[in-house]
Amino acid sequence: MPAYIIGTITVRDPEAWKAYVAQVGATFGPFSGHVLFRGRKAGALSGAAHGERVVVAEFPDLDSLRRWHESPQYQALIALRNRGADVVLTAYTD
């Protein structure tokens, strides 16, 4: 069953964030993950959303998603990610 990760993002350091984004995509492949959508908030319709940006990525299953998140390749980027932005990551399945 597919699993999805949704990241809500508030960029604090655009240069650090740009460097993170340039590298993070390569970490998905070994876990058969891919980005479905990246975008900026266009406006609130109901309630308050965290972040000005969002990313949605799909993995074949929750185990693959968790293995990606815990992988040395991704873990090595977390300090750069945290320097560049406030990020909330949440996993979802059916």
Task: Give the ranges of each region predicted by the language model.
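Short, conserved catalytic or adaptor-binding loops enriched in Gly and charged residues
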Residues: 26-27, 80-82
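Low-complexity, intrinsically disordered Gly/Pro/Thr-rich segments
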Residues: 71-78
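C-terminal end-helix/capping segment
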Residues: 82-94
